[in-house]
């Protein structure tokens, strides 16, 4: 098997200036002239104080960020970022998992996508990985409970090892861990580097003496420049050559960190021989290649749907809350509007009932907002690494919520419909259930879209509340279309409430189209004042609009799903840039 050596040639990175700012200000460099080399079976530790540029350098080495100048080479060949990501793995500082899945289930999901043609080997691969990471005894433990910080970090490392990368990059793998857990993590990384003959590069703030014994080479950074790059056991000699003697009570690295600001000349490693440019014959095609996924779309959707169902089933509290909420609210409304009749008072009450129904159904979906926001970093990590297609995630999410929200719609509709005494027709009832179902699906898509945009739960909740209030205000229930200022008229047509309210009104009064709802009685003369058709005419509605409103609601459902996909696609592309 071919072994790889990773190197960089004069990498610099400057913080991009805003194109909107017309200024002659020079760019601020975070990294300057970084030239390094990392060999297989060795750990290279990037060490430096906060703000030295460690994380930025790792992002560049992982091909997540493009350097301002310089190049990354693998066996002296300029890398193609897309191809390079297939043989490398990046482990971020913060662990992100689904807390309701077990360690084994988390590994099995990724392994099934990475080994679609060898599904029989998945269990053996997972078992072997659990053993290698000393996690066998925690295989059936849920990630949200019972795992220490060090064990969670090992799970993150395990996920990155499933496709057996040649280069493993880790951002602060010991951050937030106690000394023993930190040592255990680095010890496992050392074992991986030697047993698999892989390149391991990690950033670390200030390693302990025990951890230093596991590190082969160090790259000491200060203010974005290299102070020293080489073997750890040669650091003391380097310091001596600069006129610094290491005190007996300190090791060479501790002393180097203390006098970092006094080592004025950045270290230049004369032993690293890198070409200024790669010969054309050795250059890889720099054009971004199409990402080829290891699993088919059907396999991806199937596995993602299975994971979604498992998480929903295990979120029993939310599941039962949604079902009970729909049942209780439906029954309470049914008893409040019990047999409301069809007269003048009944017409007014129906408007109120339908308006409240829409408010309840659309606002209740905000319960899923924190779940979607918590899932987002996991989704970005998995899709940016090429584990599965983003579109497969959106489709699987849709397929799972279709039957789940249909159940909610049926429970709410049946508990309400007959108590209120709405139009008794199986066709009308079926249409009512259909509209309620599409409303909750549309609301789910709306929340999904906002969760892709919102930076956090508080901002997401505020956005949902403000926009739903605006949609309700411009629905025509409070202010008619004719009374709206022309410059606000567009909001009337963008209001989700409008089409949903119109659909419910048309369904009810089409059924009562020829029935007299309000009579004029004087002496022996009885004449009909208002029919169901008159109610529709007064509100500018017609029976032929019945399916138009359904199509509009479906359009909103699809639109918000597509917008969510585009926002997430932009985020995924940003994490690969």
Swiss-Prot record:
The keyword ATP-binding applies. GO terms for molecular function: ABC-type transporter activity; ATP binding; ATP hydrolysis activity. Keywords: ATP-binding, Membrane, Nucleotide-binding, Transmembrane, Transmembrane helix, Transport. This is ABC transporter G family member 4. It holds the Pfam family ABC2_membrane_7. PANTHER family: ABC TRANSPORTER G FAMILY MEMBER 28 (PTHR48041), ABC TRANSPORTER G FAMILY MEMBER 4 (PTHR48041:SF9). Residues 6-248 form the ABC transporter domain. It comes from the Eukaryota. It is found in: Membrane.
